[in-house]
Amino acid sequence: MKQICLALVLVGTWILFTFCSFSQGTNIQKPIQYTLKSDFFLSTSSLPFWHYANQYNLTPKQQHFTSITQIYLNIDYQKDSLKKHTHLLGWGSEVNGIVQKSLSNKLKIVFPDFFLKLRLGSLEFWGGRRREIYGFVGDTTLTSGSFSWSSNAFPIPKIQINTLGFIDVPFTNSLLQIHATFAHGWLDTLAVDYGARVNTVKGYLHQKTLYIKIGRPSWRVNLYGGFNHQAQWGGENQIWPDGLPPKEAWWAVVIGKPWQGSRVGNHLGTLDLGMIWKLSDDKSLTFFRQNIFDDGSLYNFLNIKDGLQGVTFRNRSTPNYTRTFTLEKINLEWLNTTSQGGDVFDFQQQIFGRDNYFNHYVYPQGWSYKNEMIGTPFIPKQSDILNPLPTVKNLMTINNRVQVVHLGASGWIDEWKWLIKASFSSNLGTYDYPFPTPLKQFSGLLQIQKELPLLQGIDWTTSIAFDSGLLYEPSLGIQLGLRKRGFF
């Protein structure tokens, strides 16, 4: 009941703010985009991998039957959002309420998107929860998931300043463009597995990114490069005697300052390289590589073998329904995390192996939020893995040395839109707890979607997903969904 009341208060506040803005004498004309969506999931055991992975932790994976109803309202920037400053100022807002219900759980209401954004020229300021992905990939829909920040966990509340996409570097005539972000976020209470002073602390997130684009819009080839850096921190003055106060700890996190034989906080991210090659006006190839860093091993290129790489073909031409088959996009990726800088970690000798991705020696929940991995879903938490494998206390994952081949594709057959995902992985465990033999796993998804003309623009979606292998419980699942979009 409290959740329902809170949901009504939040939505009511958003609507009141929106319509009060409309009532001002500035002739603001900002159409509200809405989406109404309802999905039903049914499976033979727990949900198959591709019915819950990269879904922002919105589909309960341990349930045989789940229904999810979504109400999405969005006001985006408009050129007339402020009459006197057409190109300088603007505002927008978004609220996305989701109602979850399964056979064994009570009704649950969550808000994965609830934020207000303000624009000042080429800069954007926003605060709240917002669905995002960080890291250069060929396609955010077909990807296996960006390594450090995919769409796998529930959005983290943040305040952020960023550029509105790529913006021109002055005096380069669009030859150089940059895209940058800087954010502070609030994590849940973090458990502590270090020392004996405290058991829990308040957790925070630091995040920054910087990407550079080389090449003018008219060029056939554009090059990309940059990084994303995340850090999980908090409680430094509580965990360690004479520890850093919060302000000093925050600055040490921002600059990656060495401290207490390591660094303040749990740091990770990727250094990314990419290239977009325009084959024609409506077709392109994207090549990308994410190089992983986690405690300094990339500095000496010890873990250079690890990373996510791939190629994406994109066909932007308008679907021709007179054709039987149209390929829209195809994405092929290879993820490797087996090196981790080698089997040796020696801080004095500056040998930074055993990166132990997504685990941490101070914060046992590792790189996770609300009990779900923030990064790639192919490094799973312990509870997702089959029970015969041993449970290790104070480790978020016992399988962070993986190799994955992933294929995603989408297109049209007549007026039916289709999408497939197929992923094969070899799972080695961790350096400290290796599996006796590599565990093989296959996960697949086939989805079809069609607009129903008799129902005024309602889309119907059906998907079938299945898991087969030794890492997850074998499962077969089906999803049925309806979606209505429009403006008012």
Regions found by a protein language model. Give the residues of each.
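Beta-barrel outer-membrane channel/assembly domains of diderm bacteria
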Residues: 21-132, 141-142, 147-149, 153-166, ...
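Short loop/turn motifs that connect adjacent beta-strands in outer-membrane beta-barrel proteins
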Residues: 25-34, 75-91, 119-126, 166-179, ...
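Transmembrane beta-barrel strands of outer-membrane/channel proteins
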Residues: 32-48, 89-99, 118, 125-131, ...
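Extracellular loop and loop/strand-boundary signature of outer-membrane beta-barrel proteins
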Residues: 53-59, 96-101, 143-149, 192-198, ...
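Solvent-exposed loop/turn segments connecting transmembrane beta-strands
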Residues: 63-65, 99-109, 293-301, 398-402, ...
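Outer-membrane beta-barrel "beta-signal"
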Residues: 158, 473-488
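Signature for the C-terminal beta-barrel architecture of outer-membrane proteins
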Residues: 162-347, 351, 405-407, 424-430, ...
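C-terminal structural cap/anchor segments
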Residues: 341-429
